[in-house]
Design a protein with these regions (language model features):
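Amphipathic alpha-helical packing segments from all-alpha helical-bundle domains
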Residues: 69, 94-98, 110-136, 141-144
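C-terminal peripheral helix-coil segments that are non-catalytic and often amphipathic
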Residues: 1, 86-91, 121-140, 160-174
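Amphipathic C-terminal alpha-helical segment
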Residues: 106, 147-166
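Hydrophobic alpha-helical connector segments
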Residues: 59, 69-98, 143-146
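Short helix-capping/turn signature of helix-turn-helix
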Residues: 50, 103-110
Length: 174
């Protein structure tokens, strides 16, 4: 995979637009032409920053993961479950959308390998952080259940169009 050129404001704008599209409708929800139009550049210019759609989606997933993990790492291990729950809930309240890596995970069998690896990285890092709790040790098995509950709760909130569904589904998370 060619490393994208990220030193431009256009690259960031392209990633922002791609993230919105992916969170709304998945990997196949956008084309370079649509993104170029949104950002205000020629569609051929998108290839300067991201040679392929897979490169762009992988960069978006990497950035999403890095931001999410950095926010969780700032929290003490004993409050990470609640911090993760709060982050998922606030993301839904902000724009009614799904977790980027949750959406991509649902399409993982059809994703380019470079994108699927970034999605797996998100879950591996989150599971590691959630099972790192000092008080009342959380096993990997429990961490898997927590992630499944959070992703599923987002899905339910989206289906029902109400954060209440998320709250009810995650009430038992401590």
């Amino acid at each position: 995979m060619a490393r994208p050129r990220l030193k431009s404001n256009n690259a960031g704008k392209l990633m922002d637009a791609a993230e919105r599209h992916i969170r709304q409708s998945g990997y196949n929800a956008f084309s370079f032409r649509e993104l170029a139009k949104e950002v205000g550049i020629k569609s051929s210019s998108v290839h300067y920053y991201f040679p392929t759609k897979a490169d762009l989606a992988a960069a978006v997933a990497r950035r999403y993961t890095d931001r999410f993990v950095a926010a969780l790492q700032e929290k003490s291990p004993s409050v990470r479950i609640q911090a993760c729950k709060k982050a998922f809930r606030e993301a839904y309240l902000t724009d009614g959308q799904m977790c980027l890596c949750g959406v991509l995970a649902s399409e993982s069998a059809a994703l380019p390998e470079v994108v699927a690896l970034e999605v797996r990285r998100f879950f591996d890092l989150c599971l590691g952080l959630l099972s790192e709790r000092k008080e009342g040790a959380v096993t990997r098995k429990v961490a898997l259940g927590i992630m499944a509950k959070l992703e599923g709760a987002l899905l339910l909130a989206r289906v029902y169009g109400a954060v209440r569904a998320f709250d009810e589904a995650t009430r038992s998370l401590q």
